[in-house]
């Protein structure tokens, strides 16, 4: 096997290697990322595919960068899985390909058409798909002109009947940036931290007329992105002033005036990681922060 030295997990007698998988999926027909008994999920499909291709005795256990909700899409999702080196070799067969390339090819053949693995590679030392990440970037697409609604894009674009004022929305988003407690925009989970660093939140009018929101943070809590979008839509329509989202933020509790927007407009576009030599330290830091 060539390329980066494998990230070995566990004792020398039980050496396992860590693989990084980059994938995309149309979330329309999935009940989110996380495996749930009796429901079709991305994790369930991918774990089953890996288990089948590598003929594993137990279902493959996956760690994901961002646990997307039901209906949310991903163009740049990242996952890691720990396996034994001889298990990876089973993907090669008679293909003559490198094991990682062979696994990616075979997974593309096994997975359903609404999910695809773009790349498989040996993870650098210290890599953790979730905790090594320094940022996640989401995109939200809106059509605010009924005459320009494209039925062919109905699975990824949310349609509104009222035009939105981009300048007003961007004036409001600037007040949300930085390290803050976003409890007012998160679905409450017992013991879970709601402190996040919002690095970017802006709206742009694209050449095709769609409005695109780009939201970047170190991490997001449950339903945070869709609530942030929902807080800005009434600013764009003029129903609320530009100070409204910041006022909601300071309350620290969910506000019934903030609508959690539909899932299908949201897509995980990119997950950012530090340089290889900083991966392990970042993972330790992130774990400690989540446990605070």
What kind of feature is each model-predicted range?
Residues 2, 7-292:
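Structured-RNA-binding interfaces characteristic of tRNA pseudouridine synthases
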């Amino acid at each position: 096997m060539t390329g980066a030295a494998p990230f070995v997990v566990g004792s020398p007698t039980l050496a396992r290697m860590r693989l990084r998988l980059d994938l995309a999926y149309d979330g329309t027909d999935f009940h989110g990322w996380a495996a749930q008994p009796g429901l079709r999920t991305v994790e369930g499909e991918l774990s089953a595919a890996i288990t089948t291709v590598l003929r594993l005795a137990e279902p493959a256990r996956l760690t994901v960068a961002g646990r997307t909700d039901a209906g949310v899409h991903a163009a740049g999702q990242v996952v890691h899985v720990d396996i034994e080196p001889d298990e990876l070799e089973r993907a090669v067969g008679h293909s003559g390909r490198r094991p990682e390339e062979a696994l990616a090819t075979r997974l593309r053949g096994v997975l359903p058409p609404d999910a695809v693995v773009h790349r498989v590679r040996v993870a650098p030392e210290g890599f953790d798909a979730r905790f090594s990440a320094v940022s996640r970037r989401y995109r939200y697409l809106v059509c605010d002109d009924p005459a320009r609604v494209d039925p062919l894009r109905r699975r990824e674009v949310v349609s509104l009947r009222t035009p939105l004022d981009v300048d007003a929305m961007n004036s409001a988003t600037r007040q949300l940036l930085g390290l803050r407690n976003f409890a007012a925009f998160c679905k409450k989970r017992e013991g879970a931290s709601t402190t996040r660093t919002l690095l970017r939140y802006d709206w742009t009018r694209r050449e095709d007329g769609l409005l695109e929101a780009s939201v970047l943070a170190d991490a997001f809590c449950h339903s945070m992105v869709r609530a942030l979008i929902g807080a800005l839509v009434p600013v764009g329509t003029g129903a609320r002033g530009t100070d409204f989202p910041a006022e909601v933020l300071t309350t620290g509790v969910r506000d019934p005036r903030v609508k959690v927007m539909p899932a299908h407009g949201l897509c995980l576009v990119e997950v950012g990681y530090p340089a290889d030599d900083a991966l392990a330290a970042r993972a330790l830091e992130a774990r400690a922060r989540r446990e605070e």
